[in-house]
């Protein structure tokens, strides 16, 4: 997809979901386009060109995570978001940073497996239908004598076979049209191997995962007859047939390549593993996490159960609010590995208005769609939208700035009564006015103590 996506196109796509923050959008758009540019180079030059990792700096709720998440969807690339605070230095209790790459590979394998299954959907559907038809119309057997010669003429056998095929096609059409969905049949299905719980100490998740895989591989493939509706049986049989048709070794190879060439790791809360400049105490584990991240970000080799991964060309996007610590509190080596710095701005009232209205699945559109399921036509006046934005901004200023997430809290409080009474409401056209917003939220905003706990 990135082949035809210029940086301007990428920014335009991001603008459908994220309001403002143009500097951050441009930075990630250039990084994504550089992926494609690198793949056009000759092999020798391609190995030398490494991604320019990004450090996003900005308060919570301004779009840091959303930018990275949408970028991964646009790139159709393996993507993982991790909290830097979840990891500890090697030797301490907790997850070590190499598990980031192992989780990224797992994500890529699932992604490539789904892609492979999609390619064989039609064939798998046909085979699944055949399995159901074999239960509904068991294939006729030609009666044979003890010496192995057929007792009936060949013409009769051919006629029976033709009649059987016609019957099968009639039933196939009925299955495809959903006419037999609720009919129950007994079908042979594969039994999923039982998961064996392995107790392991904290931080040893990789070892316990490998032990579970070992026990699973030792269990033989068992099958059992199960009674279910045809609708469910078709889905189950289709999944089983698709799994047989795909090449697992090819999936693994393509997943490893996708991670190495296009993988994106989003490191959130990077500021929480900074050593505070004012703190003279021992922050061994925090600084240790940064030192462990260094080889990953710079380029190293990580062993996974699917194969070895080189992290040289994986794009790392780190982000943090940096309220207490500063970017300069990161260890110098890690600062050097995050050359592109982008500062995301705090949201203003106008930004809140746009967030409510403009994105493809904006908050207002979501609530309107939810109420539509109850037969209620919900609408908002322009002044009411601005008032909601002003309230969200004011509460952020006075209580705690949580960015755009404040809008969800405000909207839930505003529409609480309508949402609760929706099934019994006689009036199906509801228009939200400024007066209604003031009535529901006015007192809460004025009373700082109340807004602190409710909004």
Curated annotation (Swiss-Prot):
Gene3D superfamilies linked: 1.10.8.60, P-loop containing nucleotide triphosphate hydrolases
Molecular function via GO: ATP binding; ATP hydrolysis activity; peptidase activity; proteasome-activating activity
UniProt entry tagged with the keyword Acetylation: no
Location of the protein in the cell: Cytoplasm
InterPro entries: AAA+_ATPase, ATP-dep_Clp_protease_ClpX, ATPase_AAA_core, Clp_ATPase_C, HslU, P-loop_NTPase
UniProt binding sites for ATP: 19, 61-66, 268, 333, 405
Cellular-component GO terms for this entry: HslUV protease complex
Keywords recorded for this protein, A-Z: ATP-binding, Chaperone, Cytoplasm, Nucleotide-binding, Stress response
SMART domains referenced in this protein's UniProt entry, alphabetically: AAA, ClpB_D2-small
Gene Ontology biological process: protein unfolding; proteolysis involved in protein catabolic process
Region (Disordered): 144-163
Domain of life of the source: Bacteria
Chain segments annotated as transmembrane: none
Major subcellular site: cytoplasm
PANTHER family: ATP-DEPENDENT CLP PROTEASE ATP-BINDING SUBUNIT CLPX-LIKE, MITOCHONDRIAL-RELATED, ATP-DEPENDENT PROTEASE ATPASE SUBUNIT HSLU
Family: Belongs to the ClpX chaperone family. HslU subfamily.
UniProt subunit comment: A double ring-shaped homohexamer of HslV is capped on each side by a ring-shaped HslU homohexamer. The assembly of the HslU/HslV complex is dependent on binding of ATP.
Summary of the function given for this chain in its UniProt record: ATPase subunit of a proteasome-like degradation complex; this subunit has chaperone activity. The binding of ATP and its subsequent hydrolysis by HslU are essential for unfolding of protein substrates subsequently hydrolyzed by HslV. HslU recognizes the N-terminal part of its protein substrates and unfolds these before they are guided to HslV for hydrolysis.
Protein name per its UniProtKB record: ATP-dependent protease ATPase subunit HslU
Phylogenetic classification of the source organism: Bacteria, Pseudomonadati, Pseudomonadota, Gammaproteobacteria, Thiotrichales
């Amino acid at each position: 997809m990135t082949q035809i996506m210029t940086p301007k196109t990428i920014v335009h796509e991001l603008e459908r979901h994220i309001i403002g923050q143009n500097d951050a959008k441009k930075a990630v758009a250039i990084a994504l386009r550089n992926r494609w540019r690198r793949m056009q180079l000759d092999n020798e030059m391609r190995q030398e060109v490494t991604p320019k990792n990004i450090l996003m700096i900005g308060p919570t709720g301004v779009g840091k995570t959303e930018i990275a998440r949408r970028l991964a969807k646009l790139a159709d690339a393996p993507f993982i978001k991790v909290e830097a605070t979840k990891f500890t230095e090697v030797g301490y209790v907790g997850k070590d940073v190499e598990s980031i790459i192992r989780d990224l590979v797992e994500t890529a394998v699932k992604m490539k497996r789904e892609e492979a299954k999609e390619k064989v959907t039609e064939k798998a559907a046909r085979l699944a239908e055949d399995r159901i038809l074999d239960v509904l119309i068991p294939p006729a057997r030609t009666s044979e004598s003890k010496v192995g010669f057929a007792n009936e003429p060949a013409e009769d056998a051919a006629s029976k076979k033709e009649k059987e095929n016609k019957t099968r096609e009639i039933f196939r059409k009925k299955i495809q049209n959903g006419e037999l969905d609720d009919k129950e049949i007994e079908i042979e299905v594969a039994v999923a191997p039982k998961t064996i719980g392995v107790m392991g100490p904290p931080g040893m998740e990789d070892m316990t995962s490998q032990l579970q895989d070992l026990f699973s591989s030792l269990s033989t493939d068992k099958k059992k007859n199960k009674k279910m509706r045809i609708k469910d049986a078709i889905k189950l049989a289709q999944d089983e047939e698709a799994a047989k048709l795909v090449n697992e070794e090819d999936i693994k190879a393509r997943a490893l390549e996708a991670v190495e060439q296009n993988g994106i790791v989003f490191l959130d809360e990077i500021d929480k593993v900074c050593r505070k400049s004012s703190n003279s105490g021992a922050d061994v584990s925090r600084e240790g996490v940064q030192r462990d991240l260094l080889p990953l970000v710079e380029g190293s080799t990580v062993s996974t159960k699917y194969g070895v991964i080189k992290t040289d060309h994986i794009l790392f996007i780190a982000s943090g609010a940096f309220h207490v610590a500063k970017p300069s509190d990161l260890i110098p080596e890690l600062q050097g590995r995050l050359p592109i710095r982008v500062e995301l701005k705090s949201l203003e009232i106008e930004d809140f208005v746009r967030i409510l209205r403009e994105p493809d699945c904006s908050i207002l559109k979501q609530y309107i769609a939810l109420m539509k399921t109850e037969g209620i036509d919900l609408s908002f006046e322009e002044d009411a939208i601005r008032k909601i934005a002003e309230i969200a901004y004011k509460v952020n200023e006075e209580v705690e700035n949580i960015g755009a997430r404040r809008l969800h809290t405000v909207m839930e409080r505003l529409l609480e009564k309508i949402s609760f009474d929706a099934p019994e409401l006689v009036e199906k056209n509801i228009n939200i006015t400024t007066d209604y917003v003031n009535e529901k939220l006015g007192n809460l905003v004025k009373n700082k103590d109340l807004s602190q706990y409710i909004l």
